[in-house]
Amino acid sequence: MLKYINTFDNVLTRENEFGHFTASSWVLNKERTKVLMIYHKIYDSWAWTGGHSDGDNDLLYVAMKEAKEETGIKSVSPISKDIYSLELINVNGHDKRGKYVGSHVHLNVIYLLEADENEEIHVKEDENSGVKWVAIDKILEVTSEPWVRERVYAKIINKMKTDGIIGNV
């Protein structure tokens, strides 16, 4: 990622059609037993919240903003301001708002956030068709993208266990 940043000056915008930065989050409930997930229309899967940086270099801010926009929660806070994980995620070509977007890479930065499970949630109709709290031990069952499930989500769950953020679920 560092080499890519040093090579291109537009990695924070979608103008870089080969790859650009995105920020995602695992929004945990206060008991740290569930993650707030969305049913993503493009990926056709339950997924974490997140989005493009669109020129903003404060990726924690982007992750928090996207979590609020995509789920309707009003209050979310970082468990830590540190980046929790980095991922290079291939995005296959797809149609978005009537326009074809070619295959590209998301240079994805992941943060751990916390929100109140009792806060009202709602769908962001242009991006997702569902929002719900998913028990951590069920995440790998509800996610239908094999690579993300096995290489990203499983890794994050194991890291959270190792780091003592969650218990053995």
Name every feature range the model reports, one short phrase each:
Residues 28-30, 35-65:
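Glycine-rich active-site/cofactor-binding loop and its immediate structural neighborhood
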Residues 22-24, 33-35, 128:
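Short glycine-rich loop/turn motifs
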Residues 14-16, 36-38, 51, 122-124:
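Short histidine-centered beta-strand/loop micro-motifs
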Residues 1-24, 168-169:
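Acidic, metal-coordinating catalytic segment for phosphate/diphosphate chemistry
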Residues 7, 16, 41, 48, ...:
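Residue-level signal for pocket-adjacent positions within structured domains
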Residues 54-147:
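Unchanged
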Residues 18-23, 30, 41-43, 48, ...:
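Short connector loops at helix/strand junctions that flank enzyme active sites
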Residues 144-169:
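Charged phosphate-binding loop/patch that engages nucleotide di/tri-phosphates or the phosphate backbone
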